[in-house]
């Protein structure tokens, strides 16, 4: 089987995976590779079951606003590792939603450029504790391997940048929790946008709606958190 560059980089040697097999170009290919093994997988199921129950009980107009705490959730990062968001507790992080097939320059591509620029700015400013989290809208396409390639394409350094994917149920729960609206139309995903700065205790310290947020505003807010 042939695999994509991102999956090849991850490796998955000795791990249990699920994947789709496809035959084209006179070769078999493995696509949509997701790990399904280990304690991380079981913990993720338990955490996300609680997330789903909490989301189902939410009122229609409820979502996480500035000053409120985000729920715990578990996803898989661009290295094929399970991550619970509470593992970042103690470190502030910037969170947004993107999908790799987005073709509107002012939406996901622009947001990812700003996230990568902010990572560079944080490193240059010595704000080494600041983390970055991007969650995909499109888990049907955005496997860990695809996100791995996406990170490389935008120059995102993996040590403190987490690109996350999971099944559609988890993604849908998070979209509702964070007040993001999506609609599939003409082969793409139309969506609203929000970018959040989450403090060391899991509380939203700053939230900006829309696609035109400023890295300067987020850097100023993050600096205040890290220099407290």
Kindly label every feature range from the protein language model.
Residues 13, 35-85, 113, 117-120:
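N-terminal "domain-start" segment that seeds a small globular fold
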Residues 71, 159-161, 172, 176-196:
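Structural micro-motif
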Residues 71, 83-114:
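Short active-site neighborhood of thiol/selenol oxidoreductases, capturing the structured segment around
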Residues 110-174:
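Structural microenvironment flanking redox-active thiols in thiol-disulfide oxidoreductases
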Residues 22-24, 99-100, 137-138, 156, ...:
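Solvent-exposed coil/turn segments that connect beta secondary-structure elements
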Residues 120, 181-228:
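Thiol-/selenol-based redox modules, centered on thioredoxin-like
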Residues 2-18:
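Short nucleic-acid-contacting surface segments enriched for D/E, G, S/T with interspersed K/R
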Residues 20-29, 34:
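Short, charged beta-turn/beta-strand-edge "cap" motif at the junction between a beta-strand
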């Amino acid at each position: 089987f042939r695999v994509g560059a991102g999956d090849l980089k991850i490796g998955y040697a000795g791990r249990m995976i699920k994947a789709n097999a496809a035959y084209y170009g006179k070769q078999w290919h493995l696509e949509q590779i997701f790990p399904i093994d280990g304690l991380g997988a079981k913990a993720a199921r338990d955490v996300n079951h609680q997330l789903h129950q909490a989301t189902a009980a939410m009122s229609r107009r409820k979502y996480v606003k500035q000053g409120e705490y985000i729920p715990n959730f578990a996803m898989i990062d661009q290295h094929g590792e399970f991550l619970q968001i509470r593992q970042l507790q103690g470190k502030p992080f910037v969170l947004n939603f993107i999908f790799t097939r987005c073709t509107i320059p002012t939406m996901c591509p622009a947001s990812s450029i700003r996230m990568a620029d902010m990572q560079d700015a944080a490193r240059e400013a010595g704000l080494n504790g600041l983390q970055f989290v991007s969650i995909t809208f499109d888990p049907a396409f955005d496997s860990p391997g695809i996100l791995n390639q996406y990170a490389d394409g935008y120059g995102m350094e993996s040590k403190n940048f987490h690109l996350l994917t999971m099944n559609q149920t988890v993604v849908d729960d998070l979209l509702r929790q964070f007040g993001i609206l999506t609609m599939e139309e003409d082969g793409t995903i139309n969506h609203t946008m929000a970018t959040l700065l989450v403090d060391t205790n899991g509380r939203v310290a700053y939230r900006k709606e829309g696609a035109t947020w400023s890295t300067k505003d987020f850097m100023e807010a993050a600096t205040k958190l890290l220099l407290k």
